[in-house]
Amino acid sequence: MSDSNLTNPIKAFFHDEFPEQYQEPPGLQKNMKPVPDCGEKSYKGSGKLTGRKALVTGGDSGIGRAAAIAYAREGADVAINYLPEEQPDAEEVKELIEAEGRKAVLIPGDLSDESFCQDLVKQSHHELGGLDVLALVAGKQQAVENIEDLPTEQIYKTFEVNVFSLYWVVKAALPYLPEGASIITTTSVEGYNPSPMLLDYAATKNAIIGFTVGLGKQLASKGIRVNSVAPGPIWTPLQISGGQPTENIPKFGQGTPPAPLNRAGQPVELADVYVFLASENSSYVTSQVYGITGGIPTA
């Protein structure tokens, strides 16, 4: 028998039923029950990103928050983007980044606006003194059971936030990105196995896969790598603010189909992948998608 202190992954994080809950979108992480684990108390860095300059969209909560915290603890200065309504969560992230002795830049705004995306990149580059990591995590997800009830306005907005903003941010950032820079997008298991109530969201996540693979090939000659992360059911404000029907929240991650690990993932469980893809440890990795799904297939 091994003497190592291993943990059963089924029990590594919260694995009971969640309380039924709902917040008006976009929702605040600080008001969730339980509050998602983004590594605030557990993530320990080792200098993998010393001196780097990162922009993280959706950096106030959930997966983006976990990436921002990890980047700071690995030695990077970090700019985060979020919606103005998410300011309370963003202020917490700012404190966590600055506690590591790193610079934190808060830039609220709506990614569905192309001009804002351009300004976001310019401000990030100016205030950080450079830019060499784009972690594009922000997303919009609203469940609608029947296509007849899916508003055209929602379809447009979901594509603008989830897909169009990637084009706008990357186009604005390319003049600043040096050789060795890394672009990380965020797709989803929904891009491979769509839920019937997430037609617009799933379509955007499939589009992100094509965008990532193609852009990685296009930018390889410039020495810029492009990869994506495909989360499974992760406990974030996206889920409790309309991303899932309220009645599905208690068994989120345990529903149909369930993750084989039979629980929702926590944002901190993706942090190492965002660090790896930003760091030189992934120097031979581009145009790839990394699934962090609790065992749900991505093929």
Swiss-Prot record:
One Pfam family linked to the record: adh_short_C2
Superkingdom in the source lineage: Bacteria
Name listed for the protein in its UniProt record: Uncharacterized oxidoreductase YhxD
Region Disordered, residue ranges: 1-44
Catalytic residues, chain numbering: 201 (proton acceptor)
Residues reported to bind NADP(+): 55-79
The keyword Oxidoreductase is assigned to this record: yes
Signal peptide stretch: none
Enzyme Commission number(s) of this protein: 1.-.-.-
Listed GO MF terms: oxidoreductase activity, acting on the CH-OH group of donors, NAD or NADP as acceptor
PROSITE patterns cross-referenced by the UniProt entry: ADH_SHORT
EC supergroup of this enzyme: oxidoreductase
Keywords assigned by UniProt, alphabetized: Oxidoreductase
Family: Belongs to the short-chain dehydrogenases/reductases (SDR) family.
Binding site for substrate: 188
